[in-house]
Amino acid sequence: LWWLEWGGRLDTVHESETIKWELWKIVWGVWDYIKNSGEFPDADTLTIEWVGLIPGKRESRRFLGDTLLCQQDIIEQRDHYDAVAYGGWSIDLHPADGVYSEHDGCRQFHSKGTYTIPFRALYSQSLDNLLLTGRLISATHVAFGSARVMCTCGVLGEVVGRAAAICHQQQITPAQLAQPARVTQLQQHLLRAGAYIPRQRLVNPVSTARVAVSSTLQLRALPADAGWQPLQSRCALLLPLKAGERLPAISLPLRAAQAQTLQVTLLTSDNPANTCGDSLLASQSIRVQGEERYRLSFEYRADCDRYLFIAFEENPAIEVALTQQRLPGVMMVFNSLNPRVAKRTRQINDGDYGVDEFDFWLPRRVPHQILFAFALEAPLKLWHSDYLLNGKLRPEQHTNCWVPALDDAQPHVVWRWDETQQARHITLLLDNDFDHAMETVQMGHAQAVT
C-alpha cells in the first residue's frame, strides 16, 4: 500500500534500516487492527504471506544536470529546444511524516496537458560519461513528484539508450549531444522509432512526394444504432477543426418523458495543443420533450487547428442516442473524477501553490466508452491524405491521420516523385488507437488477444 510511508525526514540512504523497522511496526500494527478490531469480518481467514525486507524509496538521491526540471516547466508546459520525452502525471506530493502526518496521504496538482522533458536533465553536470534516467534525473523535489512514475521512466530509458548509442558512435559527450546543432538528430531518431515528443515533427524523407489516395472519409453523420443513454454526468463530444474552418450546425436524437431544459456549451482550450476545455466560447439551451432530433448551432470559426468540446450538462431525465461507430480522433469525454487520484471534478487552487484551476475531462476505458449519434449540416474533413506526410504521429490539435471512405472496398495510397528515389526500407504507421484510454496494460484491456 503506497500510503504506508515513513522516513521522509531521514536520510533514506544511510538510515534505511531505521526506516525498515518503523515500517514493519506500521504494517503489523495495521494488520493487527484489520484482524482483531472486528471491523473487517471478511479478514478472519486471511493471512499475510510476505512483507518486504528493503524499504522502497519513493525519493532519494538525484543528480544535477545542465538544467533542472521544475514546477513551472510542468504547469506552464514549457517547450525546450532539446525536448526528448514527455510526462503527464500530476505533481504528486506526499507528506514527509508519512502515516503520522496530519495531512492527506498525497496532494496532486495537474497541468493542463503533457509537458516536455529536456535532454539536459538526463546527464550529470560533473561527469562527462554519465547519462541519467528514472528517478535520478535532474529535477526539483516538486517536479520529481510528476516525472518519477514508471511510464515516464520507461520513456526516458528509451531516450537515454538512444543517446548513449549516438555518443558512442560519434565519440561525443552527452553535453555535446545536447547542443542545439546536434540534439535534433537524437530527436529525429526517437521520432522515427515511434516515440512521442510534444510539438515536434518527424522530418519525413518522403515529404517531397505527391500523395494520391483511393478515397477520404468525411464526417457527416454517425448512425443511432446502439440504444440510449441518460445524461448522468456532464460530458462533451470532442471534434477537431482546421484553421479557418467553421463549425457546422449539429443535430442529435434526444428524448425526455417530460419537458426538460438542456444546457449546451462550446468550449476549447486556451493552449490549442491541450484538450482541457478551459475556455468558454458560447452557450445555448434547448427544450427537450418527447423523442426527436434537436439542432445546435454555434457561430464559430477556428483561429488555428484545435479541438472543440460540445459539452452537455448533467440531466438524467434526458437521454441521448448512441452509435456503434468509432472513428479516429472523435470521442466523448466526461467531467468526472477517478477516485483513486482525485476528490473533485475540478482542480481547485486553495493556496499559494502556483497551479491552475480547471475542470477534469476524462475519457472512459473500453468497453465503457460511448459515442453520441449525431449529424452535421455540412461535412467535416477530419482526415487528410496530407497527414500521411506531415510528420505528426499523434492526434495533436487534429487527427493527423488519413481514413478512407467506409464504403471503399480496396483503400490504397500512391506516392509519386518527379525523380527516381532510392529507399532501403519503408515504415507504415497504422492506427494505434490513441483514442483508447489505457495508461498501461496493467489496467487490463477488454480487447486483449490472450
Task: Report residues per predicted region.
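Flavin (FAD/FMN)-binding glycine-rich loop and adjacent Rossmann-like elements that form
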Residues: L1-R246, A257-G290, E299, F312-N349
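Short, conserved beta-strand segments of beta-strand-rich sandwich/propeller modules, principally
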Residues: Y307-F309, H425
